[in-house]
């Protein structure tokens, strides 16, 4: 095991986190004021930057023969994620989303519990799980009986950070790091194998770094298109459109509202999100090839065909079950499409109370939850 290479991986990852932390810090200055920005993001940036610089200081540059090997790649990926989650938890904790060291008259046990909650929220974000502990009983920003929407009561800059963690986690923090590491030392493919799931890693470009840039470019483009669609077609506020675009493309499901997409009560918003949830469930390599005109790749791709089949079958069966209990056909199709894609891609948005749907519909959704995972 070459620990200097591990220090390089971890060090550059910690330094790379300064970019999203700094970005959200600046947005917090604009939307919530200097005091909160300094309180929430400055400590996280100092910790991340200090640790990153210290680890890079321990790195001894290797020659071309000392490329990144599978052993260092797998260990590095295993260490990057918890370290990233730890740094990602600090803005919630220091910023008062959960009880932290800057909350007045807080007990030590509550501060420790607040750190655990912050860790949970960060882990859920970076892994795109979408579960949340933001509630009236957990957040000091939510007053029971007074605050109607607990999530929306949080500072804007910290909600943006929450959504951005899902966006970064969706393509993979390590995938982003490959853009840097594959240039500094060799062996980027080893890091990719350690990070990415699936039977193979297709190269869209001659070099792995170019492939990573191509995929991130596609990811960014789709995110921007969804932002614009939600804002100018769906009628969302700019802030909500940005946040929901950040959490749709990674199939994350964080929302700025307790009621999720149901809050907007808009068929237009639901249709836009349906389109992008479907795209988020498609292999990005395949989307790139289709964008280049290679539609035969989609026809031949077994994964894509299976995706279409199980989504289509689920939509037909659940729609029939809803129509049989008196739901109008158009509404049944819309609700079914939304929740089949939301659950089938593990996004987790909700636009209706599907717990009240017929038993057969709930069973199908449960099976989709397993398949989508």
PLM ranges: what are they?
Residues 1-373:
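Membrane-proximal intracellular helices of multi-pass ion channels
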């Amino acid at each position: 095991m070459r620990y200097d290479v591990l220090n390089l991986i971890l060090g550059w990852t910690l330094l790379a986190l300064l970019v999203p932390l700094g970005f959200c810090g600046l947005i917090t200055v604009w939307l919530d004021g200097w005091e909160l920005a300094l309180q929430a993001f400055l400590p996280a940036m100092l910790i991340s930057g200090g640790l990153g610089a210290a680890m890079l200081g321990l790195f001894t540059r290797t020659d071309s023969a000392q490329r990144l090997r599978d052993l260092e790649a797998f260990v590095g990926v295993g260490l990057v994620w918890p370290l990233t989650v730890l740094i990602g938890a600090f803005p919630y904790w220091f910023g008062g989303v959960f009880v932290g060291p800057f909350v007045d008259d807080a007990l030590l046990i509550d501060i420790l519990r607040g750190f655990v909650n912050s860790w949970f929220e960060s882990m859920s974000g970076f892994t795109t799980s979408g579960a949340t502990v933001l509630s009236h009983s957990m957040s000091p920003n939510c007053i029971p009986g007074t605050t109607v929407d607990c999530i929306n009561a949080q500072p804007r800059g910290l909600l943006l950070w929450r959504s951005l963690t899902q966006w970064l986690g969706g393509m993979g923090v390590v995938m982003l790091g490959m853009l840097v590491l594959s240039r500094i030392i060799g062996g980027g493919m080893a890091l990719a194998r350690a990070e990415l799931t699936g039977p193979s890693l297709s190269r869209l470009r001659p070099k792995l770094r170019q492939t990573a840039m191509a995929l991130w470019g596609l990811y960014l483009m789709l995110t921007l298109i969804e932002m614009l669609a939600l804002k100018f077609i769906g009628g969302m506020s700019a802030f909500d459109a940005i946040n929901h675009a950040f959490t749709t493309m990674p199939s994350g499901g964080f929302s700025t509202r307790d009621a999720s997409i149901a809050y907007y009560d808009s068929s237009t918003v639901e249709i836009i999100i349906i389109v992008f949830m479907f795209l988020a469930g498609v292999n990005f390599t395949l989307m790139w090839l289709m964008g280049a005109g290679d539609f035969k790749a989609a026809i031949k791709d077994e994964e894509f065909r299976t995706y279409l089949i199980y989504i289509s079958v689920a939509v037909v069966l659940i729609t029939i079950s809803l129509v049989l209990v008196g739901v109008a056909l158009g509404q049944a199709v819309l609700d079914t499409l939304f929740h089949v894609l939301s659950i089938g891609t593990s996004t987790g948005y909700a636009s209706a109370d599907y717990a009240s749907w017929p038993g057969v519909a709930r069973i199908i959704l449960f099976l989709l939850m397993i398949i989508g995972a």
